[in-house]
Amino acid sequence: MSADHEPITLETYELALLRRTRRAREFDQETIERIFGEHLAYTTGMVNSGQQLAAGPVRDSPAEEEHICGMGLFQQGSLDKVRELANADPGVRQGLYRVDVMTWQTPAGRITFTNPPPV
């Protein structure tokens, strides 16, 4: 790095990408709607409790099997903890979704939340 530039400080987050499973096609519409409602209640509760920073659907993902259909942003400091939380999601437990968890970094101060999680 040249002396002309300040070093960049990075903030670390965990990103959970939710994928619809191949098994999802085995579920009838009523079951999918029930599981989705349970999933939505679970993720809303995690955001409201501060365990998860944000969650929501992903639009315009390629319409292929196991496409990404949602994402969650965490700042737990542990991929294992995020995997534990994500795998407890009713949609994951019941086989409608699977989740990929990874670390994501961005320059510090770029992301702010209007309702910060409780400390």
What are these regions (language model features)?
Residues 1-119:
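Conserved, structured core segments of small domains
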